[in-house]
Curated annotation (Swiss-Prot):
Domain EGF-like positions: 56-96
Protein name per UniProt: Epigen
Lineage start: Eukaryota, Metazoa, Chordata, Craniata, Vertebrata
Organism: Homo sapiens (Human)
Residues carrying covalently attached carbohydrate according to the record: 37, 41
Residues making up the signal peptide according to the UniProt record: 1-22
Length: 154
């Protein structure tokens, strides 16, 4: 067991070091190049490959502005289609579904079940108490008939 702790500490330290090395990013100032009427900013971040879900998407063109019903429209170049970023409370491909907050109304059935459970529990305790008292009284009874002060005529 003593050997297990240093090994786990060693593994944890190596994992933290690996994460730190992956998270380290050097930032270089952008290079601006004038191309016609367009200004292009190039940085090292443009050359980094990332997951598709995190890639930048541009705002939709005017013909797609009404595509999203309850959200902001963005055009994803790799998917080559308009996607929606829904406002809070809406879901769906075009943010057309309202997310309803659901809650359950307390019904009387729940309270009836709790009442029956408590009643059965109390009844069980009473039966156990009755059996205990009866057994105790039977142990205390003497096998002889002892009168408590009354005398019967012979």
């Amino acid at each position: 067991m003593a050997l297990g702790v240093p090994i786990s500490v060693y593994l944890l330290f190596n994992a933290m070091t690996a994460l730190t090395e992956e998270a380290a990013v050097t930032v270089t100032p952008p290079i601006t190049a004038q191309q016609g009427n367009w200004t292009v900013n190039k940085t090292e971040a443009d050359n980094i490959e990332g997951p598709i879900a995190l890639k930048f998407s541009h705002l939709c063109l005017e013909d797609h502005n009404s595509y999203c019903i309850n959200g902001a429209c963005a055009f994803h170049h790799e998917l080559e289609k308009a996607i929606c970023r829904c406002f809070t409370g809406y879901t769906g491909e075009r943010c057309e579904h309202l997310t309803l907050t659901s809650y359950a109304v307390d019904s009387y059935e729940k309270y009836i079940a709790i009442g029956i459970g408590v009643g059965l529990l109390l009844s069980g305790f009473l039966v156990i108490f009755y059996c205990y008292i009866r057994k105790r009284c039977l142990k205390l009874k003497s096998p002889y008939n002892v009168c408590s002060g009354e005398r019967r005529p012979l």
